[in-house]
Amino acid sequence: MDLNYQVFTSISKNWWSASLVPVACGWFIGNSYKPRKDYENKKQPKFHPPASAFGPAWTLLYLTMGYASHLAYKADPLMITNASRNGSILYIAQLAANFAWMPLFYGLAKPKLALADLGILTGLVGWLAKTWWPLAPTASKWLIPYLAWLGYAGYLNLGYCLLN
């Protein structure tokens, strides 16, 4: 078993680690890359939520994606099926893309690059949901709020790029 499978299985084996590892990583990255002062003076698209909404929203999303990974792991703990093996790769890849967004947008101040990352992330999560469906349909369903939020985040990121 390669490193990706080992990481996925060690994280997803228990529902609490599956849920808390993404939350902890997201919290660390979120607190490492705060919006710059000039960000507050930039134009925002309509329906932009207050900054205080992002922390709770992402916490819930990380919990749901983590729980989805646990459900997929439980469906095939030995990772025998292609859906399980490919899903583990996609899950780790989408986490990497997710965790890259804040450094790109806030750290490097590259909103267009962050938008490209968000497009890749959305594609990965959609592919992950499709991959997990035959193995664990409930796991795929737990990704629906995440996909919906990524669509909204794409709107916000694109709006920011167009307005500034």
From Swiss-Prot:
It is a multi-pass membrane protein. Its main location: mitochondrion. Gene3D superfamilies: TspO/MBR protein. InterPro entries: TspO/MBR-related_sf, TspO_MBR. One of its GO terms (cellular component) is mitochondrial outer membrane. The chain crosses the membrane at residues 16-34, 52-72, 89-106, 112-132, 141-163. It is found in: Mitochondrion membrane. Keywords: Membrane, Mitochondrion, Transmembrane, Transmembrane helix. One of its GO terms (biological process) is tetrapyrrole metabolic process. Belongs to the TspO/BZRP family. May play a role in the transport of porphyrins and heme. PANTHER family: PERIPHERAL-TYPE BENZODIAZEPINE RECEPTOR, TRANSLOCATOR PROTEIN. This is Translocator protein homolog. It comes from Schizosaccharomyces pombe (strain 972 / ATCC 24843) (Fission yeast).
